[in-house]
Amino acid sequence: MSEKEKESHKLGLSVGSSFQNTQELRKVLEQSISREEEVLTASQPVESEQNKEESQVAGEEVETEASAGTLSRLSRSGHRRREKVEARSKDQEDVEELLEDQEDEKSLGRYATKRPVPLSLPIAFSVLLGLVHVALPFINLLATNQQTQDLYAGWAMSQGQVPYGHFFGVNGLLYYGISALGSLVGGQILLVVFQILAYFFAGTSLYRMVRSLVASEKIAGQVQLLFYLLVGVLGFGGNYAVFYSLPFLFGSMNFILAYLEGEKTDESFASYGAGACLAFMMVPWLSMIFYLLAFLGLTAYHVKQKKFAHGFYQFLAGLLGFSILFYPLGYITVWNGSFGYAIHQTLYSLRSLQFDAGHLFANLVYYCLLLLTLGFASAFVMSFRKVSTSGQRMIRFVSCFGLLLVVVIVVGTPEQGAYQFLSLLPFGLPLFALWFAGEESTYQRRKVKNNSIWYLYFFSQAFLPILAMAYLVGYPVVNQFVLQNNLANERSTIAHYIKSHSDSKDTIYAWDQTAHLYQESGRLAASALLTPTAYLGPKENRTNLINQIKQDKPKFIVVNKDLDVTSAMQKVLTQSYEKVNQKGSHYTLYQYK
């Protein structure tokens, strides 16, 4: 081999070895670069440590201070991303729970009218309240003037008298028919049965209405229980005409809610009109206010939805249903000649409004205290929260304006009494339901454990409802059996004297606070206005009272010494009557000369 060939061979070996070394170096560099890329995509500190170990195996020369800083920053960013993912998952769970609750509420509102109503509570409270009835002898002593007049009405009709003619009647004809039937059969015990049925159907109708209104069976049951509590304290002893109208008023509210949900047809408004007629035949003035407001609310709804033809057709259907029942019942007053008197007397609450200084201040203070302590004012204010359905807006409109109108009428009526607030129940109870529903949703959003409605009703009002209820029940008992016990005994003595010194055809008149004396003595009244403390607001009624006494010439007139005698009445007593010697300090007995 020549020298040139040897040099070429050496050069080839060196180039080959250099090329081999270059390939090995390239492999090492590629391995280190791949390890670094894996580190950059890592999200956990543990993974970065593993990559670090792998890179150390490949070669410690690849590691630098810059890669360590990069690993630290990537670890922190991965931790932040994990926190964001966890927060989003929690928010998603809350949204899913809220959607589930809304779906449950929608399904409940859709099928509310088809579910059975729990009957244990309405049956128990209806029987309990029905047994505390003024038709029973012991409870009769606690009856108010209005209750005694209504009891007299039923008894007088069983004696052949007619309402609006022989006695002044502010209630509907159907109510007086129920009172007469109760007096004819079973010695007024049947009145207790009628009252129990009225309580029961009013409570069940209220439950259905509230359940459809707020889509909550829990609130429906609580408002139903509140209804029985208010009925017990405001209408202690029962026998008020409002009780018999409540099933129809609550039923009409439920009908409106069902219609707005698309569950009622236009033709079904005939049944709505029939219910309105039955309510009108119980309490005319209250029913007029309710159905007038309902008509305005439905009209506004039809105008907004551009359903003018539907609204007109529904009005005709409702008018037909009303007329089918009204004409046969109203014909009774035409037949006995009292139709004109019936219209005049049943609207007494609207005609007798007097806003003078005589009784206005006393009524204003008394009824404002009841509004505040029983929670009606709170329910009115809290019901103005945002509502979500057209049914809630409709019922809130009717209830708010109805509550205001009834309060104005009650304040302007001369006759004062807690029983006047019974007319607030068809308007106040839906507002209570809206109030409770709003508070319950607030509790659910804030996840508050103590979400009891009774805690809200009593505690938020400083337990004033408890004090008001205790007063309304306790005062009549204390007044009758402690403060005026001698008065009741003396009245019974005079009633026995009248019964034994007069014939069954003789009439009497009681210038007293109640109409107890007539039934106790078994004698009819000489005037359609049974007492001087009721229905004498208009001047014409005061004039009619004196004229009827002069014309009928009652054999006995009993005067309560605690009541002022008008000059016209005193003149009649002086000219035509003489005193009868009777022991007692509360009454004076006069006999016709």
Provide a role label for each language-model segment.
Residues 206-231:
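Transmembrane-helix signature of polytopic, membrane-embedded enzymes
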Residues 482-536, 545-566, 585:
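Short periplasmic/luminal acceptor-recognition loop of GT-C membrane glycosyltransferases, typified by
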Residues 413-456:
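Hydrophobic/aromatic-rich transmembrane helices and adjacent perimembrane loops
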Residues 267-288, 404-410:
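Membrane-interface alpha helices of multi-pass inner-membrane proteins
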Residues 214, 252-271, 377-391, 436:
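Membrane-interface transmembrane helices that cradle and orient dolichyl/undecaprenyl
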Residues 193-215, 251:
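Transmembrane-helix motifs of polytopic, lipid-linked glycan transferases
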Residues 290-320:
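Perimembrane helix-loop-helix junctions
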Residues 235-245:
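Short acidic/glycine- and proline-prone juxtamembrane loop motifs at membrane-interface regions
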